[in-house]
Amino acid sequence: MIRNSLTDVFFAKDDVENLHEGVLRVLSKVGVKIENDEALGIFEQHGARVENGTVYIGEVLLNKALQTVPANFELQGFDRTVQVGLDHDPVVIPTNGTPMVLNFDGSYSDTNTDDLVNFYKLIDTSDVMQVTSEIAVDVPGLDKTKDSLLAQTALLMKYSHKPIYNILGATIHNYKKGSVAQGVRENIQFAKKYYGYDDKYVIYSGTCVISPLGVGWEAMDHFMGFIKENQPISITACSMTNLTAPGSLYGSVVEDAAAILSIVVLSQLMNPGLPVLYTSLSSMSDMRYVQLCMGAPEFALITLGHIALANFYKIPVRVGGALGDAFKADYQAGVESFVGLMAPMLSQSAMIPHGCGTMGSFNLTSYEKFIMDEETIRYLMRLRRGFEVSDKRKEKALKDITKVGPRGNFLGGRTPKEYREDNYLASEVFNRKGCKENTREEQGDIRDRARKVYDARMEAYELPDTTLEQKKLLNTELPEQYKFDI
């Protein structure tokens, strides 16, 4: 298995300490703007300096908060749990929040509720996705004359066996019967009631800080609601170099880390021991087009910088993903996905967001790319596992080599155990059958193979075996066309 993190290739211990020193200076000298009076009062009560809505956090307070951040935690789904944290392999979660879909026929369309259901089924039948999430939010197909916050959560729950990541935030547009803060908590309480647990982590969520060095009022309402309801939070930075972050990658990492840590500290002051995820989706800007570039190599470098810092702070880190700037499931999309997935997969990461399907700088998701990205993840999981080097393996291999000798062959009898353990046999998505004319005709294009996998998964999908009470609860919020017949 992997013995050293990829971060060690790029950052020496002194480098990480240098980054940390930069973070401390930003936290204590520049501060973070927090748009929530209650939070400002909590910071002040614990000794932080607060001036005109800006919080200044010193090293002592930071270290105190870091001591209570759990290294690991468990997410509860409908009928399964997932272990997340520093002592586990990365948990892969799907794309979320993309407003457009690239369809199998090559057309583009706005993501709608039917797309949501299709992707929920795809996620639920995935062998690499351990958590599900809203693919997009506030989409066409929802009744916008009504509050749609809980309707979208109910739709996700109906089709999911797996634990859920709730990218959906309460807003003044999808929750009108009260404040945003009330909507956040009602959504969480709905999830607790559906799963039947008040003392487990049944829904984790997060939102973005505002770069540079701010946390807006809606984000604060979101964070505060989850902290008070004792559910895990993901604190996300998504800055752009030379626009909302300095031009240097060093500056990008340090600035974002300070903003993320401000909410880590708040969470532990309010609810010591609450699981938090340190999340970065920041990347470079291409100033020729003033465009965020999620497929750039700098995205991987920024990601690795944040992994190194989060590991230094002993906070579970959620970074990277099969992201990119391509708008077709083409060679560019594949390269970008691999670069974005490689950094967290070959290091000590707790979770990988946007694991499958995302492209177009967060604006687009693709059915076929989702299937292809799953195979990329399997390849990287195989790389992460490495291969066994031991006296037992050595003696067996040398015995076989000695027995066969020069110019022999090793084919004979049953396939040996070590072959089955050491070799990953790719799925039908990738071709490994050669390239003769009949093979080319039989295999077709990779998009055709992805479509076959998709169709088989849709046919194999089965709804969770919900109780009558759970069905009734979901029916109170589900969009009309998705209600259970009971």
Curated annotation (Swiss-Prot):
Instruction: Could you list this entry's UniProt keywords, alphabetically sorted.
Output: Methyltransferase, Transferase
Could you state one GO biological process linked to this protein?
methanogenesis
Induction per the UniProt record? Up-regulated during growth on L-carnitine.
Q: Which reaction does it catalyse?
A: Co(I)-[quaternary-amine-specific corrinoid protein] + (R)-carnitine + H(+) = (3R)-4-(dimethylamino)-3-hydroxybutanoate + methyl-Co(III)-[quaternary-amine-specific corrinoid protein]
Which EC class does it fall in?
transferase
Q: What is its EC number?
A: 2.1.1.383
Q: Name one GO molecular function term.
A: methyltransferase activity
Q: What does this protein do?
A: Involved in the degradation of the quaternary amine L-carnitine. Component of a corrinoid-dependent methyltransferase system that transfers a methyl group from L-carnitine to tetrahydrofolate (THF), forming methyl-THF, a key intermediate in the Wood-Ljungdahl acetogenesis pathway. MtcB catalyzes the methylation of the corrinoid protein MtqC, using L-carnitine as the methyl donor. L-carnitine demethylation generates the unusual biological product norcarnitine, which is likely degraded by other members of the gut microbiota. In vitro, can methylate free cob(I)alamin.
Q: Which family does it belong to?
A: Belongs to the trimethylamine methyltransferase family.
Q: What does the subunit section of this Swiss-Prot or TrEMBL entry state?
A: The L-carnitine:THF methyl transfer system is composed of two methyltransferases, MtcB and MtqA, and the corrinoid protein MtqC.
Its recorded name reads L-carnitine:corrinoid methyltransferase
**Source organism (scientific name):** Eubacterium limosum
